[in-house]
UniProtKB/Swiss-Prot annotation:
Gene coding for it: BMP15
Secretion signal, residue range per the UniProt entry: 1-25
Subunit (UniProt): Homodimer. But, in contrast to other members of this family, cannot be disulfide-linked.
Alphabetical keyword list: Cytokine, Disulfide bond, Glycoprotein, Growth factor, Secreted, Signal
Naturally occurring in which organism (per UniProt): Ovis aries (Sheep)
Propiece span(s): 26-268
GO cellular component, one term: extracellular space
Xref: CDD domains: TGF_beta_GDF9B (cd19402)
MF GO annotations: cytokine activity; growth factor activity
Membrane-crossing segments per the record: none
Glycosylation sites: N86, N237, N374
Record protein name field: Bone morphogenetic protein 15
Gene3D superfamilies assigned: Cystine-knot cytokines (2.10.90.10)
Disulfide bond entries: C292-C358, C321-C390, C325-C392
PANTHER family reported for this sequence: BONE MORPHOGENETIC PROTEIN 15 (PTHR11848:SF22), TGF-BETA FAMILY (PTHR11848)
């Protein structure tokens, strides 16, 4: 409970900070985020940027779009949110965009056309668009008839303007029932819209036709909704998920390449010598149960107040590291050379230098399915969300 209370305080403090930053920007004062060399806020900010807001409730998203994304999530992650190794999604983020509005009108008797507008969010440098598809129902079954439908790009004063035949269909495993079609429109989105600045809207036409010989129905799409029959899928990859490690200084690199374990052995030898040096007792290492180790911890998104926009998973197991770092850092802790030297300095030179702390060493990602403020549904893999092992550094 204490950890949960502390986490809540930190989260609300971050929210207040972000609101203050927005207010400062609105009155013309520079925010901290725009100052040079300002450190980026942690991952929690990225999560909060996707949230609808404290006062907004979860947008009502039902029907096939939600079912599609839930199935995509279940195929890509397990019940705890861990990404599956055999996932075939081909991206670290998928956004389902529903049309903002539609203009429907009967045309040429048996033809029925809807014009659909899909808003495209501003580009983010960290994410690269790798695929774009439109999903629609190619068969609409009504009370007294049925319609055959297709999607085409909207072009002013053009009765028909089909997508290139090479763009039809999808090479990925389909999550769709037989009455639905997924069509690749990456070329159209990439060339026409994606690199444009300012407000961008993808406009498509949903065209349906009644079978020949059937009674012409004069209706305005009663009983059907384009919000549930057509949606856009945008696939992204995180370009910053794999960060290159900085090279070691030339001297240290040559030293470690000759004998990588030499520095570690010397540090251990110095540690054993330090035990014979007169000084304050270092018996605070304590019993083995107090040694630095990984501790399980689980919290629900409902406890964090995020369940109004996070669909899955329901529980989050971040884990945490706790315990005393030993006086001699053994190999299993994976401590960096700096921590080993710092430990020696604390033992032999200056006891005011703090000993290394017990912190997470390795993390694993978590997949989250959430609803954005505009009603879009987002699947996203967040790196560094679950601590898997600990180290002293």
């Amino acid at each position: 409970m204490v950890l949960l209370s502390i986490l809540r305080i930190l989260l609300w403090g971050l929210v207040l900070f972000m609101e203050h930053r927005v207010q400062m920007t609105q009155v013309g004062q520079p925010s901290i985020a725009h100052l040079p060399e300002a450190p980026t806020l942690p991952l929690i900010q990225e999560l909060l940027e996707e949230a609808p807001g404290k006062q907004q409730r979860k947008p009502r998203v039902l029907g096939h779009p939600l079912r599609y994304m839930l199935e995509l999530y279940q195929r890509s992650a397990d019940a705890s949110g861990h990404p599956r190794e055999n996932r075939t999604i081909g991206a670290t983020m998928v956004r389902l965009v529903r049309p903002l509005a539609s203009v429907a009108r009967p045309l040429r008797g048996s033809w029925h056309i809807q014009t659909l507008d899909f808003p495209l969010r501003p580009n983010r440098v960290a994410y690269q668009l790798v695929r774009a598809t439109v999903v629609y129902r190619h068969q609409l079954h009504l009370t007294h008839s049925h319609l055959s439908c297709h999607v085409e790009p909207w072009v002013q004063k053009s009765p028909t303007n089909h997508f290139p035949s090479s763009g039809r269909g999808s090479s990925k495993p389909s999550l769709l029932p037989k009455t639905w079609t997924e069509m690749d429109i990456m070329e159209h989105v990439g060339q026409k819209l994606w690199n444009h600045k300012g407000r961008r809207v993808l406009r498509l036409r949903f065209v349906c036709q009644q079978p020949r010989g059937s009674e012409v129905l004069e209706f305005w799409w009663h009983g059907t909704s384009s919000l549930d029959t057509v949606f856009l899928l945008l696939y992204f990859n995180d370009t910053q998920s794999v960060q290159k490690t900085k090279p070691l200084p030339k001297g240290l690199k040559e030293f470690t390449e000759k004998d990588p374990s030499l520095l570690l052995r010397r540090a251990r030898q110095a540690g054993s010598i330090a035990s014979e040096v007169p000084g304050p007792s270092r018996e605070h290492d304590g019993p083995e149960s107090n040694q630095c180790s990984l501790h399980p911890f689980q919290v629900s998104f409902q406890q964090l107040g995020w369940d109004h926009w996070i669909i899955a998973p329901h529980l989050y197991t971040p884990n945490y590291c706790k315990g005393v770092c030993p006086r001699v850092l053994h190999y299993g802790l994976n401590s960096p050379n700096h921590a080993i030297i710092q430990n020696l300095v604390s033992e032999l030179v200056d006891q005011n230098v703090p000993q290394p702390s017990c912190v997470p060493y390795k993390y694993v990602p978590i997949s989250i399915l959430l609803i954005e403020a505009n009603g879009s549904i987002l699947y996203k893999e967040y790196e560094g969300m679950i601590a898997q092992s600990c180290t002293c550094r």
